Amino acid sequence: MRHLLKPLLALAPITTMAAQRPNIIYIMTDQQTATAMSCIGNTDLHTPNIDRLAAAGVTFTNAYCSSPLSGPSRASMFTGYMAHELGVERNGTPIPDSVRTRTLGTLVGEAGYECAYAGKWHAHTASIPDGEFGFRNIHNHDDAGLAEACVDFLNSHSKPQRPFFLVASFDNPHNICEFARQQDLPFADITVPDVSECPGLPANYAISPYDADIIQREKSLNYSGYPTTSYTDDDWRRYRYAYYRLVEHVDKEIGKIVDAIDKNSLWRNTVVIFTSDHGDGTGAHHWNQKSVLYDEVTNIPMIVVLPGKKNAGKKLPQLINNGPDFFASICDWTGADKPKGTRGVSYRNVAESGNANAQHQPYVVTETLFDKGAGTLGWSVRTPDFKYVLYDKGRYREQLYDMHRDRGETRNLAVEKAYAETLSQHRRMLEEWMQQYGVK
């Protein structure tokens, strides 16, 4: 009899542990900058549903993408590696076979979760192939019907037999790319009013003295990506109007998912994470789209709603990399095995503590490759007080900004003698990171 009981006793803690693990709902937009939310005081748009998540959760104000381009950023999220480690530094490059079977969906599934994916995958195919990377595809890359597919999933999982991991990945506000190219928008309709009704220009609209000159060079070499060279001030204001309407459009879709979470009483045992793969220039420094290392492009929204809405409404300043750190955090919450060689730092403990002074990590790095132009490489090192940027070519390729006094990055301190030691410290941090991550 004892030999029959042993396997049952061994399974009991696992079953209990699985029941206690939270569901995970990951809501992701494409190309949304951190300031494109009304809950942080932006009066140029209204995002009531994202605001609902912020009121219920913890907002990380210093969350950064691992790469300011969709394919590399998403590959990093779902593998736990930086894009250069994968060789996925351009859109259209597939995740290598060496890690395809150890991606996040597979690992979380092996930990006992049901994994479902709805919407844009883009790592590298537009939609996730059904059954690959550990996910069941419940809706292809199309914002129309995406929220409804997620609502149907949640309605059928109000009392799940096992925990679930649901990804809702929207395309918008990415349609701003088509807007800039004067093309039809795939997933939204926008009528731009008279310019007098459009948002004003950002405070950091002008190209700053001592800005890296390679940025404008890259812009000139990729007109299809950056068709804004001849934009007037009014054109930029229209661009900003369209961008904020696209954010509001996707906010309405997110609201359907939030309503379903309410309806099915899922808050008590669910972690809901809202974020984006990267931001958009939104006219700052005369920039649209991504790839560059301005904060409008690299600083992304990140809201974490904990089970029972613990620490609701708190804002935390800890530095987050929404590539490897997201991967590590999901492994932490689900009990999935985190592969050796992935270096992400889980933000679970910081979110659950709600302590703005809790130790997390001293800096985060974002890496970029301008994939259609001069092929410029760049890295940014964000510390609690400063941001250091290095491009591999051009004049003024080093940038240093005081992120308390100059969040708009208008005064490059790298050219000022008084900040020579701070500059050296950040150079050493980047050198340390490059050695650790094998960047030559």
Map each language-model feature to its residues.
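Short, solvent-exposed turn/loop segments enriched in Gly/Ser/Thr/Pro and often Arg
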Residues: C39-G41, G57-Y81, P94-I95, Y117-S127, ...
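Catalytic-site neighborhoods of secreted/periplasmic enzymes
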Residues: S76-L166, F170-I190, H360, K393
